[in-house]
Regions:
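N-terminal amphipathic/hydrophobic targeting modules at extreme N-termini
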Residues: 2-3, 7-9, 13-15, 40
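Short hydrophobic alpha-helical segments enriched in small aliphatic residues
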Residues: 21-24, 31, 42
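Polybasic, lysine-rich low-complexity intrinsically disordered segments
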Residues: 34-35
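Interdomain/boundary linker segments immediately adjacent to catalytic/signaling cores
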Residues: 40-126
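Active-site metal-binding core of divalent-cation-utilizing nuclease and nuclease-like domains
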Residues: 87-91, 104-146, 159-166, 173
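Active-site-adjacent loop/helix micro-motif of nuclease/hydrolase catalytic cores
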Residues: 152-167, 190-193
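Domain-level recognition of nuclease-like catalytic cores that cleave nucleotide substrates
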Residues: 186-222
C-alpha cells in the first residue's frame, strides 16, 4: 500500500492527479463505481511517477555532443547505487549519498571527499600567488585531475538555496577543470529539483548569452 504522505504529495504536484481526484470526489455516493475508477486511475499514476522518480535520470550539455567517457563511467557508478540513494525512498543527506558512491568513484580515478578535516577535503586551485603558492581554491566533492572533471553531489539545498548555481560558478573558476557533474534529487519536498536544474541549463545554452569555459556539463537526478 502506498504511504499516505506520498499520495498527498503527488496529488499536490500533478495537475492530472488533481483533476482525477476532483472528479472522483464530485461524484459523491451515487456512483461509487466511477468514483473507485477515478481513484484507482489516480493511484496508478502516483505509482508510475514514484517508479520514475526512483530511476537515475541524466542530461548532458551541450546537447549537440555525445556524453564523454568519464561522464559515462560516472553515470554507471550512480546507476549501480541508485537502489540505495534514490530520493523517493532514501531522502538522505548529500554527505551520505557521497559516502555510498565513494568506492565506485575512487575505482574510476576520482579523489573523493571523506570528511571536513583538512586532509580529507578535495581542493581545486583557482588563483596562484607569490612563488606559485595557491592563493585561492574551491572545494569539490570529487575531482579527477587527469580527466579535468569535478563532481558535486547536492540534496535539499540544490534548488532551494541555488546551490547548483554556486557549483557551476566555482567549476568555471577552477583551474584544470573542463567537465562538471552536478547530482541533485529527482524530488525534494514538493519540488522536482532535477527538472528545474535541467530547465536552467537548457535556457543557458539556448540563449547563448553566457560563454563559459566548461566543455561538458552532466546533470544527474537520483
Amino acid at each position: 500500500m502506498l504511504p499516505a504522505h506520498f499520495c498527498r504529495q503527488f496529488l499536490e504536484l500533478s495537475p492530472i492527479l488533481r483533476y482525477n481526484a476532483s472528479c472522483g470526489l464530485s461524484l459523491g455516493r451515487h456512483n461509487r463505481r466511477k468514483k473507485l475508477f477515478f481513484w484507482c486511475n489516480a493511484l496508478s499514476q502516483i505509482y508510475i511517477i514514484m517508479e520514475l522518480m526512483k530511476m537515475l535520470n541524466w542530461l548532458y550539455f551541450p546537447k549537440n555532443q555525445p556524453c564523454d567517457d568519464t561522464s559515462a563511467r560516472v553515470i554507471k557508478v550512480f546507476e549501480s547505487m541508485i537502489g540505495q540513494i534514490d530520493s523517493v525512498t532514501h531522502p538522505i543527506a548529500s554527505n551520505d549519498v557521497l559516502a555510498i558512491l565513494r568506492p565506485g568513484l575512487e575505482s574510476n580515478g576520482f579523489r573523493v571527499e571523506k570528511s571536513k578535516r583538512a586532509e580529507d577535503i578535495v581542493s581545486v586551485p583557482v588563483l596562484f600567488g607569490l612563488n606559485g603558492k595557491v592563493e585561492k581554491a574551491f572545494e569539490a566533492d570529487a575531482y579527477h585531475a587527469a580527466a579535468k572533471y569535478v563532481i558535486e553531489v547536492e540534496a535539499g539545498r540544490a534548488v532551494l538555496n541555488y546551490q547548483f548555481l554556486k557549483d557551476f560558478f566555482e567549476a568555471c573558476m577552477m583551474q584544470n577543470v573542463d567537465y562538471l557533474c552536478i547530482a541533485v534529487r529527482n524530488l525534494y519536498q514538493q519540488s522536482h529539483d532535477f527538472q528545474r536544474v535541467c530547465t536552467f541549463f537548457e535556457s543557458l545554452y539556448a540563449s547563448n548569452r553566457i560563454i563559459h569555459p566548461l566543455k561538458g556539463i552532466l546533470l544527474l537526478g537520483y
